[in-house]
């Protein structure tokens, strides 16, 4: 029973570490996938756009859409407006016909396209998380919206409304957040970007691959630091659990330790036994923590599939194991040294 409890207490910080890393990777991968789902080859943003991962704010005139549409090799230029409602969720205003032509169309699970100004399209993740269905009315941005359709996920946003309607609500008439360009041939991307930067040197212009590569852990303030704080907490918990568990084990096995000492067991041999048992506890706790991280992913995907995404990151499994084993080894030192220095006569007399 003591060992099972130790496995659990060691497994919990392992689960926390793997879950935090999985959330970071999952949300980054989801954002990258949805950006690629737009079908664009190039993204143009406003001159006062913030970090590369911030897609909200109306900073571009719609006139640029027509200007960019006329550029060489540009097959389609589409402006969108993003409005943050509840991080990390945004409402995206689109010209439905042009956006779906660029993105390859929406796959409707239920309902259909916009028909009225207050119509809203949501993807299946938002539908599952908020329990909304085609035909329902929901409140967002202090007004009612009619959910006219539910689509498959992966097309830029979880929530879509008519561009003109969102511009009016956002007091951004004639403005968009970013402009997506689809080229006649993706191989022309570098040449088109170079030409555009010569004409619009003050505007951030990215290829889709460049933009998605910017959506990473290094560009999200505080994530790396917070991850290592959690790792540090995991080390402390693992050390304390193993130290207490092995200390109790040594107390319970005082007589057995005395027998080993009387049979010629060296201090190093006794210490090695204690450390080995601690390492086994560490391995077992890590395996349990990995298993529980799959449970955490299932729970997150079931409860909040639109707001939070979690990925399983196997590359962190050996890192978690190394952290746990190091904690176990250090945690076993004091109990092991105490056991190694037991007087065999006192140990055999212990009841």
Region locations from a protein language model:
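Hydrophobic alpha-helical transmembrane segments
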Residues: 3-7, 291, 314-322
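C-terminal membrane-exit region of the final transmembrane helix in multipass inner-membrane proteins
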Residues: 313-351
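A short beta-strand structural signal in non-transmembrane regions
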Residues: 42, 126-127, 148-153, 174-200, ...
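Hydrophobic, regular-secondary-structure patches
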Residues: 11, 15-90, 194-198, 204
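Transmembrane alpha-helical interface segments in multi-pass membrane proteins
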Residues: 234, 255-301, 319, 323, ...
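Hydrophobic alpha-helical transmembrane segments of multi-pass inner-membrane transport and secretion
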Residues: 1-27, 221-259, 279-288, 330
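Peri-transmembrane interface segments
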Residues: 31, 194-240, 249-254, 259-260, ...
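Hydrophobic secondary-structure segments that place a key small or acidic residue at a functional site
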Residues: 81, 89-95, 107-165, 175
